[in-house]
Amino acid sequence: MNYQEFCKILNKHIFEGERKELLRRIAENPERFIGLFRPTKPGAKILQNLLQSHEIRMGEALEEIIEEILKDLGFEILSKSIEKENGEMLSLDQYFTDGEVYFFIEQKVRDDHDSSKKRGQMSNFEAKLEILSKKHGSKLSGIMYFIDPDFSKNKNYYIQELEKLKNFYGIELNLYYGKEFFEHFLNKPDLWEKILDWLKQWKDSLPELPEVNFDAKPKESFEEIKTLELRSWRKILDNDKLWDEGVMRAIFRDGSTLKLLHSYFNGLEGKPYKELANGLNKKINEYYP
């Protein structure tokens, strides 16, 4: 992996499709964006929502980065979906083998959970351990890995709980923070330093705050959001509060993207598209005179 590939993974997970995803969240959960009993204006609330989304997506990006590193080092990546006896599917963060031992990793960005979440995390870890131990026996090794070394709130708890599981299942289990995974498991401490350098470079290249005004780049915004599900557009157009309280105006400042959408929907065949075109036309005339 090089710096360009590293950035590509981060940008793909964190920024690609974020306009469409924001509109989807507004359509499905409008109450999170509207209401007089919020101390923030619509633009600030939208910005807050985007930043929270970036935090979540960062974890997804780091999962792919670790997977690519494992591939580069010669490990075979296995399917991350496993099935419980009741048919419920579980998803592994990392699952791979060196040809002799089978490894699974429960990977999180930081260890800052409260008591209920840390217990839930251990319960989730054991559920995966139970399934995989039946499949691989003593050839299995499990890891709990927190990438950010500055957060280790529940370290003692995890050490104690992993020791209990280790003794019960007879499986090698390890807890790592930050560099420890690269140093003790991968034997590549220099690679950790490289990742830190790449992260700093990537962060330095970002704007101070994400752009919430879709009309700043109307054609680009249009291309991304024109494929949003019809039901989401219907909910947005039917919810007058989103328009009256300025939520949609905070996203579409001058209406230029909405006008492109209106022309697009108006040119498509089918009653739903005509309904959307008519609905957009009414909103444009009312809120962008």
Residue ranges of predicted features:
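Extended, charged low-complexity segments
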Residues: 197-289
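Interdomain/boundary linker segments immediately adjacent to catalytic/signaling cores
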Residues: 1-69
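N-terminal "first-domain core" detector
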Residues: 65-66, 76-77, 88-92
